[in-house]
From Swiss-Prot:
UniProt source species: Clostridium novyi (strain NT)
UniProt keywords, alphabetically: Acyltransferase, Amino-acid biosynthesis, Diaminopimelate biosynthesis, Lysine biosynthesis, Repeat, Transferase
Protein's name in the database: 2,3,4,5-tetrahydropyridine-2,6-dicarboxylate N-acetyltransferase
Pfam families linked to this entry: DapH_N, Hexapep, Hexapep_2
Entry keyword Amino-acid biosynthesis: yes
PANTHER family (alphabetical): 2,3,4,5-TETRAHYDROPYRIDINE-2,6-DICARBOXYLATE N-ACETYLTRANSFERASE, ACETYLTRANSFERASE
Gene from which this protein is expressed: dapH
A Gene Ontology biological process term: lysine biosynthetic process via diaminopimelate
Protein task: Catalyzes the transfer of an acetyl group from acetyl-CoA to tetrahydrodipicolinate.
E.C. number(s) listed in UniProt: 2.3.1.89
Length: 236
């Protein structure tokens, strides 16, 4: 079934209707040679095995075959999860360990996603854009090309409370560390948001804003451009 990810109610419906998943990884010390694993993925031999599968099926298997098992250890990292993580194998971008990216996210060529970044469903990240450490992109947030989203910055999502207008960060915008862009705000091209700012309304192109709430303090000039220029080598 297709869902319109531009509509918060459609995203909510997708989450509601999705099959919830509690995957387990289990290390087993025992003889499973004659055990029926059914839909469980089973790898190993010589009394050591690794199992992958859904929680209830794994737990049933362990109980039914307890006489063949000496001991086991279970690893679990989620419970009743509605949305899988994004499959990043074929994405032409740099994605560092520890980034959390949900499915149905678009990431452009040569983008950089740093450790600890959290990117929710429906987000769009443009070519050459960097999402720095521990930054958060809420549902449906849109970042244009060559944006820098600073460490710890937040671009609010528009899933709950629902809104039809997502946050939009246009091309060549720099957002400083720990800044917050509130729901539905658009930041115009080439603008700069100072670190720690709270942006509560749309920002025009080519300006610098600072404060809480953020206010325009100057237009972007050559000095600003020099201080906020991006490094292409980080995107290779």
């Amino acid at each position: 079934m297709n869902y319109d990810l531009t509509n918060p109610y459609e995203i909510a419906r997708y989450i509601k209707e999705s099959k919830k998943s509690t995957p387990l990884k289990v290390y087993v010390d025992g003889n499973l040679t004659n055990c029926n694993v059914n839909n469980i993925e089973c790898y190993g031999e010589n009394n050591f095995y690794v199992l992958f599968g859904e929680s209830q099926e794994i737990l049933n298997f362990l109980d039914e075959n307890k006489d063949s098992i000496n001991k086991y250890r279970i690893e679990q990292d989620r419970r009743n999860s509605a949305i899988p993580m994004l499959d990043t194998k074929n994405i032409d971008a740099r994605i560092e360990p520890g980034a959390i990216i949900r499915d149905m996210v678009s990431i452009g060529k040569n983008a950089v996603i740093m450790m600890g970044a959290v990117i929710n469903i429906g987000c769009e990240i443009g070519e050459g854009t960097m999402v720095d450490m521990n930054a958060v992109l809420g549902a449906r947030a849109k970042l244009g090309k060559n944006v820098h989203l600073g460490a710890g910055a937040v671009v609010a999502g528009v899933l709950e409370p629902p809104s039809k207008s997502p946050c939009v960060i246009e091309d060549n915008v720099l957002i400083g560390a720990n800044a917050v862009i509130l729901e539905g705000v658009r930041v115009g091209k080439n603008s700069v948001v100072a670190a720690g700012s709270v942006v509560v309304e749309d920002i025009p192109e080519n300006v610098v804003v600072a404060g809480s709430p953020a206010k325009i303090i100057k237009t972007v000039d050559d000095k600003t451009k020099d201080k906020t220029k991006l490094m292409d080598d980080l995107r290779k």
